[in-house]
């Protein structure tokens, strides 16, 4: 039969690239699970009353090439002016060796958060290096492995200050008046829900205020002034006030460490260590504190520990502080942070080393001195005598200066009264400085760079002597060894080799959706049209971004059944927080601000109660029945008990138990009956897209994990994006922004992230995914995700019972394998199975969530039947090994499971185990063998002997 031109053009080609099983494999799996077709399987599993009659109208699919061309045309609408706006964002030079070998390398960007340290030693080492950079530059004792951005780090510092404060009756937080405005915006938002009063004043007036538990200072103020706060900090400490300091990471290379001046907490953005501005993100924040406060710190902390053989190994330390364990009592709701961006900054420091960083910082400062000297020679006045890279220049004809700047395609900071701000960076050249002279002085200024350089080289007073750093930084060998590109390339490859990512095997983590991050989706994030825009540039320079974001928001509205989408939250946890704030402010607008009870099912993800606590709500847990579903009787009882104080329920759908609950609409109706709102967590949206939607189900607000459902990679623990979809009545209450107003959704609400559109530069990934899949492909992706999960469940059911199933014994897009009976019978635990899977070449499923003693498996639609069978075969082989233990062939204390994982050095060591070396290391054969570099971690040792900085290089050898 002759094909039509449309068939030959094959606009849906990407659908077959994204979905792992081909048509024949899908049919084999359908036969195995007893279903005739994908539609028939979906009809059996998803409750009839919530199935969409037609898929959301997001358009037909496009080929990779057509979608890239379309997006390139949109991106070209952005105008790439040279931005000197500053305010915490500068242009950078990302070393090509890091761009090619890390940012564009799936071995780095497709990995998951390093909960399984044995398969994560490479990125853990890079994160430990990031912590060492933070410690050296801040002068403090403990550092985290990144927070979401500088503004949220400030909010976390405020919350931490209250936790550690000895002034228990104090309830006021003081913010110096020259912090960045976006920082103040986010701090005010967080303070409102915590019930703190924020005082904003000149830093020197802080002592005039009473009942202050914490203070936020900025070492280099938002308009450029360097502050020596040594004496002030000393006085504040004498009054037991916790002092936080925001710092510029590049300025810290030259300036004295705030920790040496007495600061308790120091934080800032690591963006200018090689991470493009990207219209606001993603960027990693650094965060450090005194040792005595370590158990009150937010976010991930990487620590040095030992493995079972006594070898040095790295792990995430002190996890009992975090939301997945402590829930509403956690220090923070942080789940996804900014690992990929922290690692870029880490490797930037490794590549340049202390000498290179000092050269870069000194060059920036020298050019700033030259600019300052020339302007002063011509009679212009600088508002500050002490500066690093930012000048606040008073101008009589401000409108004329800004007009000349625009004509020269230059952005200056324009929001300062009777002055302009100019921030230089590592990309600034002599030619740029001469151009700035022309903009500020006119073309006939007559200034010469070399002459000015001689003048300032021997007489620079722009940094106070007391503020000059007098100690060495980055003395560890890792920062002094890899400065040639060859050495750097090999070092990065050595780290990558230690880790297990999607470029080697499926990562079947339940509730994580580790699907394909296609190359075509990733390509646009490095386009300069997207990468080089300042988040506070004039909106007419970002028309491409605005068009792309508007299209993506429109598609998400259609896919979710909501009326509006806010793109600001830069992680799923931030999305939860933003959605709950919208609910809170909605109730307040109706004079029902007393509604503060949040109902949360016992099965919920730990971020849910942590976010509810952050939003100022009381958490009341709703029981689940024996089938894992929300207990409707208990829900109704708790809702009645809450009465007029009921704010909302947070529910995940399909449930975290891997089931489409039949009563989800009734759950929504009960909560609405008592005046509450329904927050539907979007963590499992990959089982909804095209089949049903939160808005159609009856929810009022959801966050969407774009780094799950919509293909943004996990990056080893970030970046993420968590935009929220809302019904119309909540739209006026989504986050706003004090610097940039969000067109189409102007609100007076405070911000939750530093940038108005969060991590805007990764939104093209989700745009590309939806554009290439179209309505047809998106629905099919959800259906195949469901098929893959049911195929695994059906094949493993006899060996590992599936804990919860829905109608007809089916699961949704993930399934929970119950290991508890086996553990009781044999002594082998879910942990042993997880570690043994490493020997078979797999990352473990999610352990002990949402039920202790279980493994939760989510294969996604991207894995082929071949890979699913390989995983199933590994699990069945492990079950046979457990049977060997049960039969007494291998003792419980010495078998391949309890000793897993096995490493290369064991092959040549003395062997005293009752099983062979081959059984130990080659259980799945020798082809494509993944070798972990450490044995099972000793978690107890790591937390009892907490060490969170770089160890001697010999320990890695």
Swiss-Prot record:
Protein name in UniProt: Glycine dehydrogenase (decarboxylating)
GO cellular component: cytosol; glycine cleavage complex
Description of how the protein assembles with itself and partners: The glycine cleavage system is composed of four proteins: P, T, L and H.
Keyword Oxidoreductase: yes
Taxonomic lineage from the root: Bacteria, Pseudomonadati, Pseudomonadota, Gammaproteobacteria, Enterobacterales
Entry's Gene Ontology BP terms: glycine decarboxylation via glycine cleavage system
PANTHER family tied to this protein: GLYCINE DEHYDROGENASE (DECARBOXYLATING) (PTHR11773:SF13), GLYCINE DEHYDROGENASE, DECARBOXYLATING (PTHR11773)
UniProt cofactor(s): pyridoxal 5'-phosphate
Entry's EC annotation: 1.4.4.2
Residues bearing the modification N6-(pyridoxal phosphate)lysine: 708
Keyword annotations of the record: Oxidoreductase, Pyridoxal phosphate
Pfam families per UniProt: GcvP2_C (PF21478), GDC-P (PF02347)
InterPro entries named among the record's database cross-references: GcvP, GDC-P_C, GDC-P_N, GDC_P, PyrdxlP-dep_Trfase, PyrdxlP-dep_Trfase_major, PyrdxlP-dep_Trfase_small
Catalytic activity line of the entry: N(6)-[(R)-lipoyl]-L-lysyl-[glycine-cleavage complex H protein] + glycine + H(+) = N(6)-[(R)-S(8)-aminomethyldihydrolipoyl]-L-lysyl-[glycine-cleavage complex H protein] + CO2
Annotated function: The glycine cleavage system catalyzes the degradation of glycine. The P protein binds the alpha-amino group of glycine through its pyridoxal phosphate cofactor; CO(2) is released and the remaining methylamine moiety is then transferred to the lipoamide cofactor of the H protein.
GO MF entries: glycine binding; glycine dehydrogenase (decarboxylating) activity; pyridoxal phosphate binding
Gene symbol of the encoding locus: gcvP
Family: Belongs to the GcvP family.
